[in-house]
Amino acid sequence: MPGTAKKATARVPVTRERALRAAMAVADAEGLAALTMRRLAQEVGVEAMSLYHHVANKDDILDGMVDLVFTEIELPADGDEWKPAMRARAVSARAALMRHPWAINIMNSRIASGPATLRHHDAVIGCCLQAGMSAAMAGHSFSLIDSYLYGFVMQESALPFDETSDIPQILDEMYEPFPANQYPHLTQFTTEYIMKPGYKYGDEFEWGLDLVLDSLEALPRV
Protein backbone atom coordinates (compact mmCIF):
# COMPACT_ATOMS: atom_id res chain seq x y z
CA MET A 1 0.00 0.00 0.00
CA PRO A 2 1.57 3.31 -1.04
CA GLY A 3 2.40 5.56 1.86
CA THR A 4 0.36 8.72 2.03
CA ALA A 5 1.95 10.40 5.02
CA LYS A 6 4.17 13.35 4.22
CA LYS A 7 7.74 13.04 5.29
CA ALA A 8 8.67 15.50 7.96
CA THR A 9 10.83 18.30 6.65
CA ALA A 10 14.31 17.90 8.05
CA ARG A 11 15.27 20.87 10.19
CA VAL A 12 18.73 22.34 9.94
CA PRO A 13 20.14 21.96 13.44
CA VAL A 14 20.71 25.16 15.35
CA THR A 15 24.30 25.77 16.35
CA ARG A 16 25.95 28.77 17.95
CA GLU A 17 27.59 29.75 14.67
CA ARG A 18 24.34 29.42 12.72
CA ALA A 19 22.58 31.63 15.25
CA LEU A 20 25.36 34.21 15.08
CA ARG A 21 25.38 34.20 11.27
CA ALA A 22 21.62 34.72 11.26
CA ALA A 23 22.00 37.57 13.74
CA MET A 24 24.59 39.20 11.48
CA ALA A 25 22.25 38.89 8.49
CA VAL A 26 19.48 40.69 10.39
CA ALA A 27 21.85 43.44 11.53
CA ASP A 28 23.34 43.83 8.05
CA ALA A 29 19.91 44.29 6.51
CA GLU A 30 18.06 46.22 9.20
CA GLY A 31 20.51 47.38 11.87
CA LEU A 32 21.09 46.26 15.45
CA ALA A 33 17.77 47.71 16.62
CA ALA A 34 15.96 44.98 14.67
CA LEU A 35 17.89 42.21 16.39
CA THR A 36 15.97 40.66 19.27
CA MET A 37 15.95 37.17 20.70
CA ARG A 38 12.47 36.64 19.29
CA ARG A 39 13.48 37.82 15.82
CA LEU A 40 16.59 35.65 15.85
CA ALA A 41 14.54 32.63 16.90
CA GLN A 42 12.23 33.22 13.94
CA GLU A 43 15.20 33.43 11.59
CA VAL A 44 16.58 30.05 12.66
CA GLY A 45 13.16 28.43 13.06
CA VAL A 46 13.02 27.71 16.78
CA GLU A 47 11.27 29.01 19.87
CA ALA A 48 13.06 31.89 21.56
CA MET A 49 13.83 29.84 24.67
CA SER A 50 15.64 27.26 22.55
CA LEU A 51 18.25 29.86 21.62
CA TYR A 52 19.52 29.89 25.17
CA HIS A 53 21.06 26.47 24.61
CA HIS A 54 23.48 28.20 22.23
CA VAL A 55 23.79 31.82 23.39
CA ALA A 56 23.54 33.23 26.88
CA ASN A 57 21.85 36.54 26.05
CA LYS A 58 21.97 39.41 23.58
CA ASP A 59 25.36 40.58 24.85
CA ASP A 60 26.72 37.12 24.13
CA ILE A 61 25.29 37.38 20.61
CA LEU A 62 26.93 40.77 20.05
CA ASP A 63 30.25 39.41 21.34
CA GLY A 64 30.01 36.53 18.89
CA MET A 65 29.01 38.77 15.98
CA VAL A 66 31.99 41.05 16.57
CA ASP A 67 34.29 38.06 16.69
CA LEU A 68 32.96 36.86 13.34
CA VAL A 69 33.67 40.27 11.80
CA PHE A 70 37.26 40.00 12.99
CA THR A 71 37.58 36.66 11.16
CA GLU A 72 37.04 38.58 7.89
CA ILE A 73 40.08 40.83 8.41
CA GLU A 74 43.38 39.86 6.80
CA LEU A 75 46.01 39.46 9.50
CA PRO A 76 49.75 40.12 9.33
CA ALA A 77 51.75 36.90 9.52
CA ASP A 78 55.02 36.36 11.36
CA GLY A 79 57.84 37.80 9.30
CA ASP A 80 55.65 40.01 7.11
CA GLU A 81 57.08 43.41 6.21
CA TRP A 82 55.38 45.98 8.41
CA LYS A 83 54.03 48.54 5.95
CA PRO A 84 52.45 46.25 3.30
CA ALA A 85 51.08 43.97 6.03
CA MET A 86 49.46 46.83 7.93
CA ARG A 87 48.14 48.28 4.68
CA ALA A 88 46.52 45.00 3.64
CA ARG A 89 45.03 44.59 7.09
CA ALA A 90 43.52 48.10 7.07
CA VAL A 91 42.10 47.69 3.55
CA SER A 92 40.46 44.39 4.47
CA ALA A 93 39.16 45.85 7.75
CA ARG A 94 37.50 48.71 5.87
CA ALA A 95 35.85 46.21 3.51
CA ALA A 96 34.58 44.14 6.45
CA LEU A 97 33.18 47.20 8.21
CA MET A 98 31.42 48.34 5.06
CA ARG A 99 29.83 44.89 4.71
CA HIS A 100 28.66 45.10 8.33
CA PRO A 101 27.90 48.80 8.99
CA TRP A 102 26.48 48.07 12.45
CA ALA A 103 29.84 46.73 13.63
CA ILE A 104 31.79 49.97 13.79
CA ASN A 105 29.92 51.16 16.89
CA ILE A 106 30.60 48.01 18.89
CA MET A 107 33.86 46.56 17.53
CA ASN A 108 35.94 47.85 20.42
CA SER A 109 33.26 48.02 23.09
CA ARG A 110 33.09 44.34 24.00
CA ILE A 111 34.58 43.21 27.32
CA ALA A 112 34.37 39.49 26.52
CA SER A 113 36.71 39.36 23.52
CA GLY A 114 36.51 36.24 21.39
CA PRO A 115 39.42 34.23 19.97
CA ALA A 116 39.35 35.90 16.54
CA THR A 117 39.38 39.34 18.15
CA LEU A 118 42.37 38.43 20.30
CA ARG A 119 44.20 36.83 17.36
CA HIS A 120 43.68 40.02 15.39
CA HIS A 121 45.05 42.27 18.12
CA ASP A 122 47.96 39.93 18.78
CA ALA A 123 48.89 39.79 15.08
CA VAL A 124 48.76 43.58 14.63
CA ILE A 125 50.81 44.29 17.75
CA GLY A 126 53.18 41.45 16.84
CA CYS A 127 53.77 42.94 13.39
CA CYS A 128 54.70 46.27 14.97
CA LEU A 129 56.99 44.72 17.57
CA GLN A 130 58.73 42.52 15.00
CA ALA A 131 59.37 45.65 12.92
CA GLY A 132 61.49 46.92 15.81
CA MET A 133 58.94 49.19 17.46
CA SER A 134 58.86 49.62 21.20
CA ALA A 135 55.66 48.63 22.96
CA ALA A 136 54.72 52.32 23.22
CA MET A 137 55.35 52.97 19.53
CA ALA A 138 53.36 49.86 18.60
CA GLY A 139 50.48 51.23 20.65
CA HIS A 140 50.74 54.67 19.03
CA SER A 141 50.79 53.12 15.55
CA PHE A 142 47.85 50.79 16.18
CA SER A 143 45.81 53.66 17.63
CA LEU A 144 46.58 56.09 14.81
CA ILE A 145 45.87 53.61 12.01
CA ASP A 146 42.59 52.51 13.56
CA SER A 147 41.52 56.08 14.31
CA TYR A 148 41.90 56.83 10.62
CA LEU A 149 40.25 53.55 9.61
CA TYR A 150 37.18 53.90 11.83
CA GLY A 151 36.79 57.61 11.15
CA PHE A 152 36.89 57.11 7.39
CA VAL A 153 34.38 54.26 7.48
CA MET A 154 31.99 56.27 9.66
CA GLN A 155 32.14 59.18 7.23
CA GLU A 156 31.86 56.93 4.17
CA SER A 157 28.86 55.11 5.63
CA ALA A 158 27.07 58.39 6.31
CA LEU A 159 27.37 59.77 2.77
CA PRO A 160 24.12 60.18 0.79
CA PHE A 161 25.65 58.28 -2.13
CA ASP A 162 27.79 55.23 -2.84
CA GLU A 163 29.84 53.94 -5.75
CA THR A 164 26.70 53.02 -7.69
CA SER A 165 25.07 56.45 -7.35
CA ASP A 166 24.73 59.08 -10.05
CA ILE A 167 26.93 61.66 -8.32
CA PRO A 168 26.45 64.49 -10.86
CA GLN A 169 22.68 64.21 -10.46
CA ILE A 170 22.96 64.22 -6.67
CA LEU A 171 25.18 67.31 -6.75
CA ASP A 172 22.82 69.09 -9.13
CA GLU A 173 19.98 68.49 -6.67
CA MET A 174 22.11 69.72 -3.76
CA TYR A 175 23.13 72.97 -5.45
CA GLU A 176 19.91 73.74 -7.32
CA PRO A 177 18.39 75.91 -4.52
CA PHE A 178 21.44 78.23 -4.45
CA PRO A 179 22.28 81.10 -6.83
CA ALA A 180 25.00 80.40 -9.38
CA ASN A 181 28.52 81.31 -8.18
CA GLN A 182 27.44 81.70 -4.56
CA TYR A 183 30.03 79.09 -3.56
CA PRO A 184 32.78 79.45 -6.18
CA HIS A 185 35.44 77.37 -4.44
CA LEU A 186 33.06 74.49 -3.83
CA THR A 187 31.90 74.71 -7.44
CA GLN A 188 35.49 74.57 -8.69
CA PHE A 189 36.27 71.62 -6.44
CA THR A 190 33.26 69.58 -7.49
CA THR A 191 33.69 70.41 -11.17
CA GLU A 192 37.41 69.70 -11.37
CA TYR A 193 37.48 66.69 -9.06
CA ILE A 194 34.27 65.06 -7.93
CA MET A 195 32.49 65.34 -11.28
CA LYS A 196 35.38 63.71 -13.13
CA PRO A 197 34.55 60.31 -14.70
CA GLY A 198 35.49 57.44 -12.43
CA TYR A 199 35.51 59.44 -9.18
CA LYS A 200 34.93 57.27 -6.12
CA TYR A 201 35.02 58.64 -2.61
CA GLY A 202 36.31 55.29 -1.38
CA ASP A 203 39.56 55.84 -3.29
CA GLU A 204 40.40 58.55 -0.75
CA PHE A 205 40.88 55.83 1.86
CA GLU A 206 44.05 54.34 0.43
CA TRP A 207 45.55 57.77 -0.29
CA GLY A 208 45.14 58.75 3.34
CA LEU A 209 46.19 55.33 4.60
CA ASP A 210 49.47 55.55 2.68
CA LEU A 211 50.09 58.99 4.18
CA VAL A 212 49.55 57.61 7.69
CA LEU A 213 51.79 54.59 7.09
CA ASP A 214 54.54 56.64 5.42
CA SER A 215 54.52 59.07 8.34
CA LEU A 216 54.75 56.27 10.90
CA GLU A 217 57.50 54.53 8.98
CA ALA A 218 59.60 57.70 9.02
CA LEU A 219 59.44 58.03 12.81
CA PRO A 220 61.92 56.53 15.30
CA ARG A 221 60.66 53.12 16.40
CA VAL A 222 61.29 53.59 20.10
Residue ranges and their predicted role:
Residues 1-39, 43-46, 55-63:
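Basic, helix-initiating cap at the start of DNA-binding domains
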Residues 166-222:
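A structured, mid-to-C-terminal "fold-capping" secondary-structure block
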Residues 1-14, 74, 184-193:
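N-terminal intrinsically disordered/low-complexity leader segments
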